[in-house]
Amino acid sequence: MAYEFNHYYELQNVATGKYVNVLGNHEDGTVKNGETVNLFSRTNNPDQRWALENFGGNGNVRIVLQRGEGWYALNYNTRNTNCIVWHLNTADDTDTVITTVEV
């Protein structure tokens, strides 16, 4: 499937059928730096909606959450193996950039 930049998608794990999800209750729209990302059953809410944002071409993208004030991107966690979300400080914030690889 081809994807469009800045269009929201739900990202599903093929093996489990579960979706990439920000853990917790965010009904008030508030997201905080460092919140854990996990796999969860489909909820049909913005905690599972992600946009692919082009970052300089060459397959470089950010995966950005729909929920929350500002831009929260999928990010790595230096303390364990779980992914987290983190607010983008600037447009040049490169620690949230990943490279897509066609398989």
Give the location of each predicted region.
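Lectin-like carbohydrate-binding module/patch detector with strong preference for beta-trefoil
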Residues: 1-103
